[in-house]
């Protein structure tokens, strides 16, 4: 989700558009139910299935006490990641951290991520989610690796992003060695903030293919990410990107994005 340079924070004792179009459907196996019904599937070898009815998976964590610089008007706050009603909620609110304040940062958001040492490579990444709807914000599901997390690598990233200003569309994007500019907006034909749907991307050496409810909707080829990555989701408010997101309207805050499950099925070409 456009992970740029990270600014660590210590305060009050707390440490914190694309290539290609729709082609013939690829041969990939999706989780049951395009609308996020009960999915009883064990994680495949070297993959995972995170069922948020079962709270925070052991392989994951919530970011806390720091913020991304540049376009992020948000500090990550671990208590903004909650588990209720058999779902994970990521919350975004006017900054209300536990006694700390960061000059120039107005909002507290949420970020869910796998541990730094848990890296995932080629394969099918799926999420059952419902994004937040409000001007100036982003809800996401993505893979990321870069120079700001140990072990340090080049910045590679693959994104599924919902711009809160128009949740009838989803944005796909990717970065290769810090170079982005591959944004592609897909018109869903429905308001994603009103119900759960399955969004996915199949990452292979020669292509990234994005899906909505099992339907192929976009493909990128050419110079693509190659580096095993963490899996992440976040909800944040932007700044200085009004043309992209619209100005933040916090009159309806707090807002939340919800997730029922995430799944990764490794490709035969993935690093083990």
List the model feature ranges, each with a label.
Residues 30-272:
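GH16 jelly-roll
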Residues 1-10:
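Bacterial Sec-dependent N-terminal signal peptides
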Residues 9, 13-20:
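Hydrophobic h-region of N-terminal signal peptides that target proteins for export
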Residues 19-34:
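Sec-dependent signal peptide cleavage junction
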């Amino acid at each position: 989700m456009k992970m740029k340079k990270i600014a660590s924070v210590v305060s009050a004792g707390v440490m914190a558009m694309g290539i290609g179009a729709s082609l013939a459907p690829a041969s990939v196996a999706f989780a049951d139910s395009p609308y996020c019904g009960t999915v009883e599937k064990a994680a495949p070898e070297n993959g995972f299935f995170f069922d948020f009815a079962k709270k925070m998976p052991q392989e994951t964590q919530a970011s806390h006490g720091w913020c991304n610089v540049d376009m992020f008007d948000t500090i990550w706050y671990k208590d903004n990641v909650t588990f209720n009603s058999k779902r994970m909620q990521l919350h975004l609110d006017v900054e209300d951290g536990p006694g700390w304040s960061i000059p120039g940062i107005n909002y507290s958001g949420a970020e869910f991520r796998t541990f730094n040492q848990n890296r995932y490579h080629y394969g099918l990444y799926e999420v059952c989610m419902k994004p937040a709807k409000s001007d100036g914000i982003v809800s996401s599901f993505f893979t990321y690796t870069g120079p700001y997390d140990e072990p340090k690598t080049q910045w590679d990233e693959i994104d599924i992003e919902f711009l809160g200003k128009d949740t009838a569309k989803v944005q796909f994007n990717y970065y290769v060695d810090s170079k982005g500019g591959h944004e592609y907006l897909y018109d869903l034909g429905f308001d994603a903030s009103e119900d759960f749907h399955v969004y996915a991307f199949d990452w292979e050496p020669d292509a990234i293919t994005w899906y909505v409810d099992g339907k192929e909707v976009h493909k990128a080829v050419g110079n693509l990410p190659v580096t095993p990555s963490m899996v992440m989701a976040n909800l944040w408010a932007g700044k200085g990107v009004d043309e992209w997101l619209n100005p933040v309207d916090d009159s309806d805050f707090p807002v939340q994005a919800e997730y029922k499950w995430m799944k990764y099925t490794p490709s035969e070409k993935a690093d083990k």
